[in-house]
UniProtKB/Swiss-Prot annotation:
Pfam families according to UniProt: Aldo_ket_red
Assembly and oligomerization: Monomer.
One MF term in the entry's GO annotations: indole-3-acetaldehyde reductase (NADH) activity
Family the entry assigns: Belongs to the aldo/keto reductase family.
GO (cellular component) term, any one: nucleus
CDD domains xref list: AKR_AKR3C2-3
Documented EC number(s): 1.1.1.190, 1.1.1.191
Name of the featured protein: NAD/NADP-dependent indole-3-acetaldehyde reductase
TM region(s), chain numbering: none
Length: 284
């Protein structure tokens, strides 16, 4: 299991309990979500990434309890979205649902709720800094923040976000590249969700086709190639699958070296065929 070099140790890759495992209705525990997280833990994932907005923190909590993995061995991330006007309450609710005394990483899920509710980003970040001081979270960061959003936050912050989590794959590289470079210049780790989007959502497109053409060259899967591409850019990949064999593939993505020419070609093809799946404001 790789560990990111900068800041608090962040296990790589992360298992994302996000839109693919979204809980659509409140009520009984969704065993499909529970079992997916348990399978991820059994396969070897120790970094679990979830969020308030997905409605499945309780399922993650059940999975953590049933898997019986020592809490000290895990790295748990969650995010606040709807309740940015009361972050302490949102944090306590996430902790309750997850059945844990602390989060390893807590993120502001998006800057958009601050604009919609006319709450200064600085106010939300101050609450995150306060949460860090309580010990209920061990590090704090943001998600889906653009360069202007980060600049606004950094004007008044006393603590730099440890992480900015964004959609990251070749087909958003045009918009993501300057943002990644900005974050890295400030010592902010970039995590990337949706790293397999070209394979899942544009399977006949040029990025997917080129990725698949590399399988025989490197003797690895297309999944591993795109995860490796993200990591080669200094981005921690966050991926999701319900298939145990695919989970093992993901955990073994760093077993080979991508040639620079192939890294560059994936980026070039992505820039030429831009396709964003989530958080459209990131292109604004």
């Amino acid at each position: 299991m790789l560990i990111a070099a900068m800041g608090p140790k962040i296990p790589v890759p992360a298992y994302g309990v996000g839109t693919a495992l979204f809980k659509k209705e409140k009520g009984e525990i969704n065993r499909t979500i529970v079992d997916s997280v348990k399978n991820a833990l059994a396969a070897g994932f120790i970094h679990i990434d979830c969020a308030e907005v997905y409605g499945n923190e309780e399922e993650v909590g059940v999975a953590l309890k049933e898997a019986n993995v020592p809490r000290s061995k895990l790295f748990i991330t969650s995010k606040v979205m709807h309740n940015v006007d009361n972050i302490p309450e949102a944090l306590n609710e996430s902790l309750r649902k997850l059945g844990t005394d602390y989060l390893d990483l807590y993120l502001l899920h998006s800057p958009i709720p601050f604009y919609e509710k006319k709450i200064p980003i600085s106010e939300g970040w101050k609450a995150m800094e306060t949460a860090l001081g309580t010990g209920l979270v061990h590090s704090v960061g943001v998600s889906n923040f653009r360069i202007p959003d980060l600049e606004e936050l950094l004007k008044t912050s006393t603590i730099t976000p440890r992480v900015n989590q964004i959609e990251f794959h070749p087909q958003v590289y045009k918009a993501a590249k300057p943002l990644v470079e900005f974050c890295q210049s400030k010592g902010i780790i970039v995590e990337g969700y949706g790293p397999l989007s070209p394979l899942v959502r544009d399977a006949q497109g040029p990025v997917a086709e080129f990725t698949k053409s590399l399988e025989s060259k490197y003797h690895v899967s297309d999944t591993q190639i795109l995860l490796k591409w993200a990591y080669s850019k200094g981005v921690i990949p966050i991926t999701t699958t319900s298939k145990i064999e695919r989970m093992k593939e993901c955990l073994n993505f760093d077993s080979f070296t991508l040639d620079k020419a192939d890294i560059d070609e994936l980026g070039t093809l992505g820039v030429q065929h831009h396709k964003r799946t989530f958080m459209k404001h990131m292109d604004e």
